[in-house]
Design a protein with these regions (language model features):
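Mature, function-bearing regions of proteins
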Residues: 2-270
Length: 270
């Protein structure tokens, strides 16, 4: 995720109402990052994301299709990854970006897996970096009602941090609003925090058009903003980690079977 507010926010709480809105739907989101060392840097931007059942993705008219296209290959098979951990789900919801004009970038996609009786079975966070790697964290499978989870970092995300560290991830339930918080904790550094809050927007052509006009090429815009912040940090003297110079294909992720289900690394040196 990208962007960070100056103020510190608490862990996400359950939205009101707790019931999932009619799907598919849109969320108007604020996304932010907050860094405290070696320099202080906060930034925030606004965008929009989709919430839908992966078995029933949004289908828009041919006229508006360039504004929203779901491509399964843009994501890991999270249902299968949950099944690999013994978690069977009959419904899988995802909060994510859809391709706009053929391009998509998802720093983070959030999943909620439900059993046949409608109870929550697991949450998951699928993380993508700007180098083409992606990794899926299945969270609190033993206690899905718990909204806060911890997991060892398994993939390079920022070239300013090494591979080690531990995430604290908090995910609310989707409703009229939602909230996600990811905090990277390392013994030698102050916590780095990324967060996202969203407000439900009904899914109709008018709402999609208004958001697409307000945030043109939203996935590309998000990536550019993330990389722009990276350039600013580098210009302010924040050093790149030695390992990060081999980014994403040479350094292999470690395995934490308690929280990590899958990763994909692409060799960008080729």
């Amino acid at each position: 995720m990208a962007g960070g507010a100056g103020e510190q926010r608490g862990e996400p709480s359950s939205p009101d109402p707790s019931s999932v809105p009619t799907l598919p739907c849109l969320y108007h989101v604020d996304i932010g990052h907050s860094r405290r060392a070696p320099v202080r840097n906060d930034f925030k931007y606004r965008s929009y994301m989709w919430l839908f059942d992966v078995d029933e993705p949004p289908v828009v008219s041919k006229l508006w299709r360039p504004l929203a296209r779901y491509r399964p290959d843009d994501h890991l098979d999270v249902r299968r990854l949950m099944a690999d951990q013994g978690i069977e789900v009959s419904k899988l919801l995802v909060l994510t970006n859809l391709a706009v004009a053929g391009y998509v970038f998802n720093p983070i996609s959030i999943y909620w897996g439900y059993r046949e009786d409608g109870t929550l079975a697991a949450r998951a966070a699928e993380v993508h970096n700007t180098y083409g790697s992606r990794h899926c964290y299945v969270l609190n499978a033993d206690d899905p009602a718990k909204k806060v989870a911890e997991a060892n970092k398994q993939m390079y995300v920022s070239p300013f941090y090494p591979l080690d560290g531990r995430y604290r991830i908090s995910i609310s339930d989707p409703g009229s609003s939602l909230a996600v918080s990811v905090t990277l904790e390392r013994p030698e550094d102050p916590p780095f925090r990324a967060w996202m809050t969203g407000e439900h927007v009904a899914n109709n052509s008018g709402a999609l058009l208004r958001l697409a006009i307000r945030y043109p090429a939203a996935p590309l815009r998000g990536r550019v903003l993330i990389q722009w912040q990276g350039l600013r940090l580098w210009a302010r003297g924040v050093p790149l980690k030695k390992e990060a110079k081999l980014i994403a294909g040479i350094a292999q992720p470690r395995c934490d079977p308690g929280s990590i289900t899958s990763s994909e690394e692409k060799d960008m040196s080729k």
